[in-house]
């Protein structure tokens, strides 16, 4: 099993700070349960349609610098609600060989529903880079 160095990320546009803190805590608990190394974490109260988010860019910088090899979120929409932004983030993760891991949803199914799975798979075939998601296999 691959050793993941994870950046735990939480985002919500709602002004309910305890709910956002709980979202991040749940992601971190799941990372710990799976035996991942939590390198850093962040949470931000921003809209999912915004691309220029300070904590998102801090996480992407960590990816670029090789400090993490996985990003862990509750679900795909925690990264963005905008398909174009999601595709940019996924391409970025793929370029750096970083896995995206979700804790509460089937990421591959979410990508299929948004139409992004086929785009990423086509890009994978063209570039030879691995897919930027992790298919979790639970022993439970």
Regions found by a protein language model. Give the residues of each.
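Short, structured surface patches at the beginning of a domain
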Residues: 1-140
């Amino acid at each position: 099993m691959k050793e993941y160095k994870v950046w735990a990320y939480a985002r919500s546009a709602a002004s309910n700070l305890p709910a956002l803190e709980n979202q991040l805590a749940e992601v971190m608990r799941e990372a710990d349960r799976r035996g991942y190394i939590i390198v850093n974490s962040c949470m931000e109260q921003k809209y999912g349609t915004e691309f220029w988010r300070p904590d998102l860019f801090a996480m992407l910088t960590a990816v670029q610098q090789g400090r993490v090899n996985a990003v862990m979120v509750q679900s795909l929409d925690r990264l963005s609600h905008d398909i174009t932004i999601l595709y940019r983030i996924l391409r970025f993760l793929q370029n750096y060989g970083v896995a995206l891991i979700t804790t509460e949803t089937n990421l591959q199914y979410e990508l299929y529903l948004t139409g992004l799975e086929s785009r990423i798979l086509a890009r994978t075939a063209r570039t030879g880079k691995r897919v930027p998601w992790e298919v979790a296999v639970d022993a439970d």
